[in-house]
Amino acid sequence: MDKNELVQKAKLAEQAERYDDMAACMKRVTEEGGELSNEERNLLSVAYKNVVGARRSSWRVVSSIEQKTEGAEKKQEMSREYREKIEAELREICNDVLNLLDKFLIANATQPESKVFYLKMKGDYYRYLAEVAAGNAKTEIVGQSQKAYQDAFDISKTEMQPTHPIRLGLALNFSVFYYEILNCPDKACALAKAAFDEAIAELDTLSEESYKDSTLIMQLLRDNLTLWTSDTQGDEAEQGEGGEN
């Protein structure tokens, strides 16, 4: 199957909501080498986001059940084994994506926009690994996530408008990283607020084609700020991810 056919099959799989098939197609497209078009890049991102998202959601449910079965040994053991099975799947998916990023995507990116997109993606998938990691392994993974986000952030500040949806999406996820993974609510709020304020100040630079994406992410930044600065704590903070492209 040539590249065009793989892309068409990925689009078909997306419509059928068969995201594992979609990811497999886009993985093959990526492994052919060369720089991905914006459309191909977005197809790859959507495919893996859905594939990993299903496991992250399952992991949260099973972890919660496991905690509630304390005292019921058999049930707890079954929950633990199932959680570990989901974790193994999640790790495999994340490592797949990180391998594609390091081997092909980041190296082949010629435009600042693409570089930021892929470095953000690298930060995201290390963050997903960090959610299920523990001990020394977690420290290492968290460091990798932070470095990728910071590298992307530095490029975005000099090369992209504050209203660019990729720059805004990066700020959104980097702030979620500070809140959820590093437990630094002050840093998370400062980052989200700065991104929101900088975008508001330059609303006139908002291009027509990215208007919808940018304003959606700005809304998510504001929602997270409201959530984080209130007394409500908890997993709802993760809603910030809804606005990724």
From Swiss-Prot:
Which tissues is this protein detected in according to the database? Answer: Present in all adult tissues examined with the highest levels in the brain.
* SS bond partners: none
InterPro entries in UniProt: 14-3-3, 14-3-3_CS, 14-3-3_dom_sf, 14-3-3_domain
Question: In chain numbering, where does the site feature Interaction with phosphoserine on interacting protein fall?
Answer: R56, R127
Its Gene Ontology molecular function terms? phosphoserine residue binding; protein sequestering activity
Report the PANTHER family cross-referenced here: 14-3-3 PROTEIN
What cellular-component terms does GO give this entry?
cytoplasm
Subunit record text: Homodimer.
* Gene name linked to the record: ywhaz
Q: Which species is the source of this protein?
A: Xenopus laevis
The Gene Ontology biological process annotation of the record reads: protein localization; regulation of ERK1 and ERK2 cascade; signal transduction
**What task does this protein carry out?**
Adapter protein implicated in the regulation of a large spectrum of both general and specialized signaling pathways. Binds to a large number of partners, usually by recognition of a phosphoserine or phosphothreonine motif. Binding generally results in the modulation of the activity of the binding partner.
* Main localisation: cytoplasm
The UniProt keyword set, sorted, is: Cytoplasm
Where located?
Answer: Cytoplasm
What's the superkingdom here?
A: Eukaryota
Q: Which SUPFAM superfamilies match?
A: 14-3-3 protein (SSF48445)
Q: Which family does the entry's similarity section mention?
A: Belongs to the 14-3-3 family.
Q: Which residues cross the membrane?
A: none
What name appears for this protein in its UniProt entry?
14-3-3 protein zeta
